[in-house]
Design a protein with these regions (language model features):
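Amphipathic alpha-helical segments in well-structured domains
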Residues: 95, 99, 139-143, 176, ...
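Short beta->alpha connector loops at strand-helix junctions that form conserved
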Residues: 83-85, 113-116, 183, 296-299, ...
Length: 502
């Protein structure tokens, strides 16, 4: 995979230090390049009729801000500087250097926040990635004032008040229209609620690249559309067996739709053959809705199920399954006897949550796809506690049970047992609809029988699921989207993949 690294505040500080200490690039050079990069973006967006104001703290983020103000003035723009701690407050070494340089030029400094609020563009350089406390008191008053101003708001690296690691909002927080972050996106810019304060996020190169990791690569990454080019083209000399056989164990009385959605999504993701195990009462519905699917009904013994498992290359189990005694038998048999990879979703997870020892029974690679409620039951943690550290919780679960965990939320987190994690950046709020998770399980299962790699199937599956939703958003909007629309969007995704691949 081609991967975009996502870093924490501490990882970014280590990169800064490594670039300076190992590669001998002075910190002030990095700061100047950071400022110049932000100014290039601003000049591309705003003409010289606009007046700028930079609000500064007293750390290195403020140093970036002062350098930005100086470069804007030197480029012929009107820009004022506001020191939130006052002009006499001492700060970091680089802050003091930039402050002195700015003073030598004699560019404008103001002490009245009302002057700042009258400008056209307000740039936040109060706090950077190191902030770990709530913004209160007079600093909160400053941020509150500029948030109310009739101006564009730009954040330098991270909006002040956003935790750069976990996306928490700490006290009064700067509400940006644009965030120019340095070298790599920070995890907190992508997670809720911090992402709501970032506006459009753009990475500004400053001279730090992957060399500065010195082999210690970040554990969190993201996929984008360019990664889809890495999916293999389907060979011309192929048949339905070439693309794998998926067994979907899904549906119960009044829940036939879950089986249809999952199986159809698997077919639409390229699986060669899909067989559904479901109660006999669902037969007519499924055969009408998805005539392409093979059907096996009323499996009521472990022996009968084992025969079907021998047919398949992978299993999806759980969508609409219920928690009946027969459903419990199906889940237990699959976990204890299957010698093929598994995708465990929905009611299968709810059954497991009542007996977590079941998850230690699996012989083959497993992908679990819980939403927050299901993860709460699995981990015996509140949803609030999970949301406070969603990446950490997904990673903990993956490691504890040796599975790949697809933890579904506003930003779905994919965590592998080896410690590698992905943040999915595709998708939209229209996808928060009944059956969306069934579609995801089918996509992941469909990819799994082709890729034979749980990590890739989970990561690509989550991304493609979101991208399919994005593809149909213009037709449905957020109110009108239903799970079947997401399946329709898969056609557009694969057409794009094949065109780009060729």
């Amino acid at each position: 995979m081609i991967l975009e690294y996502i870093v924490t505040g501490n990882e970014m500080k280590l990169l800064d230090d490594t670039t300076s200490q190992v590669f001998l690039v002075p910190s002030v050079v990095l700061m100047e390049q950071a400022a110049a990069g932000v100014v290039r973006e601003l000049v591309a967006c705003f003409d010289k009729s606009k007046e700028f104001a930079v609000i500064c703290g007293k750390g290195n983020n403020a140093g970036d801000g002062i350098a930005i103000a100086r470069l804007l003035n030197q480029a012929g723009y009107r820009c004022m500087l506001y020191y939130a701690f006052g002009t006499d407050e001492a700060g970091s070494e680089l802050f003091e250097l930039q402050k002195n340089i700015y003073a030598r030029y004699g560019f404008k400094v103001v002490s009245d926040i009302e002057c700042v609020c009258k400008s056209d563009v307000i740039i936040d350089a109060l706090f950077g990635t190191g902030l770990k406390r709530a913004i209160e008191g007079s600093l909160a008053d400053v941020i509150s004032a500029v948030n109310k101003a009739n101006a564009y708001r730009v954040a330098v690296d991270v909006p002040s008040g956003v935790d750069s690691d976990k996306g928490h909002v700490m006290g009064c927080t700067f509400k940006a229209d644009f965030t120019y972050t340095f070298s790599y996106k920070k995890t907190g810019l992508l997670l809720w609620p911090g992402c709501d304060y970032c506006g459009l996020v753009k990475v500004v190169p400053i001279g730090i690249d992957d060399h500065s990791f010195c082999g210690n690569l970040p554990s969190v990454r993201a996929l984008d559309e360019s990664d889809l080019k890495k999916l293999d083209n389907r060979p011309a000399h192929s048949n339905k067996g070439t693309f794998g056989k998926l067994l979907v164990i899904a549906g119960s009385r009044n829940m036939a739709g879950a089986a249809v959605l999952s199986a159809k999504a698997a077919y639409k993701s390229g699986a060669g053959l899909v067989k559904i195990i479901t109660p006999e009462c669902n037969r007519s519905i499924i055969q009408c809705a998805l005539p392409e699917a093979l059907l096996c009904t009323d499996i009521t013994s472990a022996k009968a199920l084992e025969t079907e498992l021998d047919w398949a290359d992978a299993v999806v189990i759980g969508p609409g399954l219920s928690k009946s005694d027969n459903a419990k038998m199906l889940v237990e048999t699959v976990l204890k006897t299957a010698e093929i990879p598994l995708v465990i979703d929905a009611d299968a997870l709810n059954i497991i949550s009542d007996n977590m020892t079941l998850l230690n029974e699996h012989k083959m690679p497993v992908i679990v796809t819980p939403h927050l409620g299901e993860m709460s039951r699995l981990m015996k943690k509140s949803i609030v506690n999970i949301q406070e550290d969603i990446i950490g919780v997904a990673g903990e679960f993956a490691s504890l049970y040796n599975v790949t965990c697809v933890l579904k939320d506003f930003r779905t987190i994919i965590a592998a047992a080896d410690g590698e994690k992905f943040i999915n950046l595709s998708g939209n709020c229209g996808m928060a609809t009944a059956g969306s998770g069934d579609v995801l399980s089918g996509i992941v299962g469909g990819l799994l029988v082709q890729l034979r790699d749980t990590k890739k199937a989970a990561a690509y599956g989550a991304f493609i699921h979101g991208l399919a939703g994005d593809m149909v958003f213009d037709n449905t909007g957020s109110y009108g989207m239903i799970a079947s629309d997401i399946i329709d969007g898969l056609d557009k995704v694969w057409i794009k993949v094949e065109k780009n691949g060729n």
